Regions:
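Active-site-adjacent loops and short helices of periplasmic peptidoglycan-processing enzymes
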Residues: 20-176, 180-189, 201
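Hydrophobic alpha-helical segments, especially transmembrane helices
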Residues: 3-4, 67, 245
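Residues in and immediately flanking transmembrane alpha helices
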Residues: 15-16, 79, 282-285
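Intrinsically disordered, low-complexity repeat and linker tracts
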Residues: 12, 24-26, 286, 290-292
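Structural motif marking the loop-to-transmembrane transition
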Residues: 1-5, 61, 112, 369-372
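Sec-dependent N-terminal signal peptides of Gram-positive bacterial secreted proteins and lipoproteins
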Residues: 2-25
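Domain-terminus/edge residues, biased toward the C-terminal soluble/receptor-binding domains
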Residues: 155-159, 167-172, 176-385
Length: 385
């Protein structure tokens, strides 16, 4: 059994090496240089870095702070702590917040969806505090959870003092840490229902407040569908953005740009460079069955078809050659009955001999256990007369 599986694995690996060989092209002459004080550009799926500059330096990040707040909000939404249709009463404290706001009225109720939209599209401080108070009882309790989450994620250059990003000497983060926060946020698909909005309005009942997305790239850069701006005198002009074209999704963060135009120019340049110089191809597709099967003991079928549990993509420079191989490690004992979705092994993807991802190999079908009568039928089918 072991020898048989080893042979299958070898064939499987060679096949994929041929299929995903990255073609060599003439090296591009242009390079990426960003003007902002700190920057970090990476592939979303693999986390591979395309460009970095002072990425670990602790700097004020202004309203990009709200990225962590939004992570908490969508976590709570997923956990059922609240629904988008919930009414949330705005406190006097929340309605009195300075800076960017949508002019929420004290003691008035707003749908949770309206508050999230206000934070994501308009960077509203009043809506931010209203959500923090609804979920944690107070802004300070929310900030404690934000810092706890930062520690959990290994964001060693991040410390929060409020949930809005308003200036505080004890509040900072880094370009690299912000990229992690944004990567976590966009894993919540509900987020994109708001982040792609260009213009909308907030309904106060007797009046409406028109809002426009502070992230201009949502409208003016093809593929940009999310992100967060920030500005204070201390932080300079900041932007964390994400864009997708084909299989490739990029994350770009810049801190302390010279002006509003320069931050958008920097992130646009980062996206352009990434999409032009890199490629992202599917190595394992969870919707497709694998080209190999594995023997099943005591099953009505001798072999089980498999598929990857999750997708794995290969991210690489277009002008560099690279080989991709996949190893399959079967489970120790694969016995019927088997249900579709049961783990039957593990798949490990390598690029140039370095592991870049792994996922379970799961059964793509149900296989029942042989009965006594199945064995009798098998014996009978082998009789000769």
């Amino acid at each position: 059994m072991k020898k048989f599986l080893t042979a299958i694995t070898a064939v499987f690996a060679v096949t994929l090496m041929l299929a995903f060989h990255i073609p060599a092209k003439a090296a591009a002459a242009d390079t990426l240089e960003l003007k902002s004080k700190a920057a970090y550009v990476a592939d979303y799926r693999s986390g591979e870095v395309i460009y970095s500059k002072n990425e670990d330096e602790r700097l004020p990040i202004a309203s990009m702070t709200k990225i962590m707040l939004l992570n908490l909000c969508f976590d709570k939404l997923d956990e059922g702590e609240f629904t988008l249709n919930d009414d949330i009463t705005v406190s006097k404290t929340a309605s009195g917040m300075g800076g960017s706001q949508v002019f929420l009225e004290s003691d008035k109720r707003y749908k949770a969806s309206e508050l999230l939209k206000s934070i994501i599209v308009a960077s509203a401080n009043d809506a931010s505090v209203a959500m923090a108070e609804r979920l944690y009882g107070s802004e300070s309790a929310c900030v404690d959870e934000m810092n706890s989450k930062a520690k959990e994620w290994g964001l060693n250059n991040t410390l929060f003092s409020n949930c809005t990003g308003l200036p505080k000497p004890t509040q900072y983060s880094s370009a690299k840490d912000v990229s992690v926060m944004l990567s976590r946020l966009i894993a919540h698909k509900e987020y994109f229902n708001y982040s792609k909005i260009w213009t909308d309005e907030i309904d106060h009942g007797d009046r409406k407040t028109e809002i426009t997305n502070t992230n201009k790239l949502v409208r003016f850069y093809e593929g940009c569908d999310g992100g967060k701006t920030g500005y204070t005198a201390e932080s300079g002009f900041c932007l964390a953005g994400t864009a997708q074209r084909g299989n490739m999704r990029l994350i770009a963060v810049v801190i302390k740009g010279e002006n509003s135009k320069s931050r958008f120019a920097d992130v646009s340049s980062a996206f352009n460079y990434g999409f032009e110089h890199y490629t992202c191809k599917s190595a394992l597709d969870s919707s497709k069955e694998l080209a190999i099967t594995v023997k099943v003991e005591k099953g009505v079928k001798k072999n089980v078809t498999m598929r990857p549990e999750t997708d794995i993509y290969v991210f690489a420079e277009k002008n560099k050659r690279g080989d991709v191989s996949i190893d399959f490690n079967p489970a120790e004992k694969i016995k019927a009955p088997i249900k579709a979705g049961d783990k039957v092994g593990e798949l490990i993807v390598y690029r140039d001999g370095v592991e870049i991802g792994r996922t379970n190999a799961i059964s793509a079908e149900n296989i029942s256990r042989k009965t006594y009568f199945d064995y009798i039928r098998d014996v009978a089918s082998n009789w000769t007369f």
